[in-house]
Amino acid sequence: MKLSVIIPVYNMQDTLERCLGSVLSQLTDDMEVILVDDGSTDGSVSLAEPWLLQYPQLRICRKDNGGLSDARNAGLRLARGQYVTFVDADDEVAPGTYAALMDLLSREEDTDILEFPVQVHYGHSSQHLFCPPSRRWSSARSYWLHTEGWEHTYAWNKVYRRNLFDEVLFPVGKVFEDMYTIPRLLARNPRVRTTQQGLYLYRWNPQGITVGADGEALCQLLQAQMQAAHLMHTHMLSLHGWRFHRSMLCRQLDVYRLTGRILLRWPFVKLICTLHTLCR
């Protein structure tokens, strides 16, 4: 088995057929699709059952509700592919994507993480394309800094060598789980390649955590960014490092405005937060 596609599902009755159809239409004999029902109450996964006879590579795993991270981890435990990738149940994958990516991986066999383009907010007025350069990176840290990896820590526009997850799992109970997970994978110094082939269609979700994040959620995001800065040895005084730290400072200002908490222990941060609040 070459590739396992993991799709967590929780109450996605309106979008699952479209999502699953976009993936199943690309199936080959050396691929499998693992649908993880995370305790849905709307009968979402029953929509997939008619496809079981047509697609023997489709498997359905049912479990009690544990959240997105727990569902992804359940899929990882079942995965048999040399590589794994993820799809959110309200998104889609453009035709021909997996064939192009697996062809590239067959020619670049030492690749551990392959990142591919995303149509961000697909179908919304804010739709825009994220398209990384086609290149092999000298190190995971170089990839992180030069592509500003903190701006696209998406789990689903990447194909991973499965054994990277032997020691890294998604954090159960956390929001912004990708910001916790991707830097931990990169800290294992995998061989990273980016490509302009393939396309993930990331649909705008007005109920998503990134749209309506409260103070506690933003605290978790900032904590994940702080962990990433440590893992990736991101120094404030370097050009690319400063951009990441600027992003962290902006997040700290949001956290202070909503909660009054200061998590960053930098000189003058408290003064900056106070002035920012007074000037609003």
Stretches with model-predicted labels:
Residues 1-220:
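Nucleotide-sugar donor-binding/catalytic module of glycosyltransferases
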Residues 154, 203-280:
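C-terminal subregions of glycosyltransferases and related glycan-biosynthesis enzymes
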